[in-house]
Amino acid sequence: SYITNHDQNFNESKKTLTQKYGDNRYPLTVLAYTVYGMPLIYNGQETGGNQALDYFNDTKINWNTQDEKMLNTLRTLFALKHAVSALSDARQSSDNPTTTLLNVSDNTSVLAYTRTLDDSQVLVVLNMGTTATSATVEGITAGEWSLWLDSETIAQGTSRKQTTLNATHTFNLDAKGYRVYVSGTYPEQNVNQHTAIRSIRSSQQDDGRWYTLTGQPILRPTKRGLYIHHGKKIMINQ
């Protein structure tokens, strides 16, 4: 699934994500990465996707123009896609996670659904409307959830917040807002570091250390959560 590709970016009259979707580009990105299938990211999309690339000529991506909201949204979605089995893609379609659309009471602007595989579950709530809204969602698995992606704070950096959701729960969402929850209990993480795209030399060697998602080196994980080790995202459940 994707919201842009090389043909659309080069051939269509509305080439960039902003031209095509406006602020819908944010919740649509979350939708593409969580509803089903394997998502595709096009060149430079993590900078905001607002550059038209000529694939017949050597057009350089402008890495100096960054959309922190899009960058941090994609960083979080990448990590969750790699580490949470409810967002995985199996070799056989019969083994894929189940996508369940949830009922949203009296609000046609909000889409809510879960992805479930065994005891792993992800809840996604998207506001496609142009104004902030309150939406009551039914059919949620009541209990402890961890908020991994929040449109209201993601531009400032990645974070994680623990919360309890009821089977019928009311969410307050900003315009074009989105939330992604993972079932279970994880340590909270505050937004505490500016994030940016950095160049990495191809000759740079793997130092074997563990890193948090904000890039902080640690000796070893001591809490549940997502970490980076040997270039891979690893979820620690203990």
What spans do the regions from the language model cover?
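Terminal processing/anchoring signals of secreted or surface-associated proteins
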Residues: 77, 192-200, 215, 227
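C-terminal beta-strand-rich structural cap/linker in extracellular carbohydrate-active enzymes
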Residues: 161-192
